[in-house]
UniProtKB/Swiss-Prot annotation:
The keyword ATP-binding applies. PANTHER family: RNA 3' TERMINAL PHOSPHATE CYCLASE, RNA 3'-TERMINAL PHOSPHATE CYCLASE. One of its GO terms (cellular component) is cytoplasm. Signal peptide: none annotated. It comes from Korarchaeum cryptofilum (strain OPF8). This is RNA 3'-terminal phosphate cyclase. Pfam families: RTC, RTC_insert.
Length: 348
């Protein structure tokens, strides 16, 4: 059996490379061997949050997996089929649900049947896009490419206890190329600010700070305030903002102990303003996540992203090892960048 061999230490050498390698293996049905997994890190090898993505995709593709244990620096993944049906994934504690969705969505839309997943874990946690970003920005922006998927938030989960619940429904999807380089005009900035098991004033202060910062730039703003004392294991708070353009541009900020609510709102608004001022169609989060879909859509795509990240650069390198494509990148890490590729397409 021939494996695609991936050096897990390439680029940042983190968990993102592992997740996308398993995702691409699941879509293409090509066995993959990943070595040097997180060897640059203080705690090298697989961590529990990485194993969650591997095992979730193994269930969906009925894969054979070797080396799937905490601390392992090498892993083999051999997918068998693109299965449909209903699955439950319990990440445990506050592992990011959004990062699991990043890994499994390409396989879900490549399946021959509809897939429904109920995922438990963290919805709003550090170092990962919040679930509201995934629903209101990522999936909204992926719809014109042909991605047929929707998210339903049932309960929020924050670090360190998690306990969030999200449902993902995905249908077989034919992907289309896109040409979106420059940022589109928009009428309003929309958003959702939440606080759970915290005083109501927290959500009000975060929202007011974001609104004030954006209105000083002459923007119309509407932010939904979500406050509850439900069965959430909490506490936690955060805000996600987005333009009503097509594509949407988004930004976010999490609350944390010791960070004033006003700073949370102002930081999110400032991040959004920076994304808008870059003048590109997609924000930097989208730039990280859209790469595989461009390669899987048959035909030429061209997109502009506000800032090329090391994650996006690594994803380009990785995709070129699975698919017969070559990306053209005009720009560089940390700068507005135009990415072009002749997508290979994927026959379902």
């Amino acid at each position: 059996m021939e494996f695609i061999r991936i050096d897990g230490s390439y680029g940042e050498g983190g968990g993102s490379l592992l997740r996308y390698a398993i995702a691409l293996s699941s879509v293409t049905m090509k066995p993959v061997e990943i070595y040097n997994i997180r060897v640059k890190r203080a705690n090298p090898g697989l961590r529990p949050q990485h194993l969650n993505a591997v095992r979730a995709l193994a269930r969906i593709t009925e894969a054979t997996v070797e080396g799937d244990e905490v601390g392992s620096t090498a892993l083999r993944f051999i997918p068998r089929k693109r299965a449909g049906g209903s699955f439950e994934i319990d990440i445990g504690t506050a592992g990011s649900i959004s990062l699991i969705i990043q890994a499994i969505l390409p396989a879900c839309i490549s399946s021959e049947e509809e897939i429904s997943l109920r995922i438990r874990g963290g919805t709003d946690v550090p170092l990962a896009p919040p679930i509201d970003y995934m629903a209101e920005v990522f999936l909204r922006n992926m719809a014109p490419l042909g991605v047929r998927a929707e998210l339903k938030l049932l309960r929020r989960g924050h670090y360190p206890r998690g306990g969030g619940i999200v449902e993902l429904h995905a249908s077989p999807s034919k992907l289309f190329p896109i040409d979106k380089v420059r940022g589109e005009k928009f009428d309003r900035v929309l958003g959702r600010c939440h606080a759970v098991k915290l005083p109501r004033s927290v959500v009000e202060r975060i929202s007011s700070s974001a609104i004030d910062t954006l209105r000083k730039e002459g923007l119309r703003v509407e932010i939904e305030e979500e406050w509850s004392e439900d069965g959430h294991l909490g506490p936690g708070a955060g805000i996600v903002l987005w333009t009503d353009s097509n594509p949407r541009i988004g930004a976010d900020e999490l609350g944390e102990k010791g960070k004033p609510s006003e700073v949370v709102g102002k930081n999110a608004a400032s991040k959004l303003l920076d994304e808008i001022k870059a003048g590109m169609a997609f924000d930097s989060h989208m730039g990280d996540m859209i790469i595989p879909y461009l390669a899987l859509a048959r035909g030429r795509s061209r997109v502009g992203i506000s800032k090329l990240t090391l994650h996006a650069e690594s994803n380009i390198w990785l995709v070129e090892r699975f698919l017969p494509v070559k990306f053209i990148v005009q720009g560089g890490v940390g700068s507005p960048t135009v990415i072009e590729v002749e997508g290979a397409g994927l026959e379902l």
